[in-house]
Amino acid sequence: YIALPFWLRPAVVNHQTQADTKMTIAAFIGLGVMGYPMAGHLASAGLEVRVWNRSPDKARNWAEQHKGTASASIAEAVRGADIVIVCVGADPDLRAVFEGPDGILANAPSGALLVDHTTASAGIAEHLSKQAAGYGQHFIDAPVSGGQQGAENGQLTIMCGGEPEAFAKARPILAHYAKALNLMGPAGSGQKTKMVNQIAIAGLIQGLSEALHFAEQADLDVRKVVDVISKGAAQSWQMENRSGTMIDGQFEHGFAVDWMRKDLGIVLDEARRNGARLPVAALVDQFYGDVQDMGGNRWDTSSLIQRLRKK
């Protein structure tokens, strides 16, 4: 039996075994609500996982829980790694972890795969891809959709931008926490696809908020209304998963308003560059600003309905 390199092994989403990737060394940078469980899936799959987090205690806790390694620095984590996976906050955070003498680019080996799950601008993805190529590394922008629940359950949707060969190598690794995993085009294409996703979500949540608010004002049984219309053309993931909590005024079930505003800011910046007209997305961004003014910074995105209920 001759063991194939990990990138030549079959890649079937959510059907990997420990033997498929047991020799792969993965560095995971950023252990937030998404990164922590994602790194855990890699460890459970049998990869050698080294983690680094800005708060060292979280890295140590992760390493103890998952029998991995908590690295003292980014440089220590990425040296000799086959794949480096990043999940941080925004463009400035990406520059902080990738660039400089102690960053990923200067310390990851030539030939390494560099995968970024951060929702960021297409411009930073294109920039880091060019920088990585200068080091002989392969960068993939790979923002995700599915939220904390998707990360914990290994059921994320991942939208990738980069070289087909690099994507083929990364796919069997990323498959450990993905239900859908697609290459959308060259560097930056993953981020642009995530922008499309956020535009659609913004409109859906605003529409659902107005529908539920109207039903409330019309003295209808709102749950019965949802039960009926969810069986027709109005059905959506948001209706199925968020209508009940919206009716109950519970907004601790997902992606925070602060992060959605960050994402919509990226969307609107890109639209100014490419000439897309996004009147509804721009309005919803302002509406989320109203929610922030109400103290809802950490409420989930379905809290748009609260600004309609405000007397």
Regions found by a protein language model. Give the residues of each.
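NAD(P)+-binding Rossmann beta1-loop-alpha1 motif at the extreme N-terminus of oxidoreductases
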Residues: 15-86, 117-118, 148
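Interdomain hinge/lid region at the active-site interface
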Residues: 191, 235-301, 308
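Rossmann-fold dinucleotide-binding core
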Residues: 26, 119-199
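Rossmann-like NAD(P)(H) cofactor-binding subdomain of soluble oxidoreductases
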Residues: 74-79, 83-84, 91-156
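Active-site-proximal catalytic alpha-helix in oxidoreductases
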Residues: 154-161, 182, 186-218, 229-241, ...
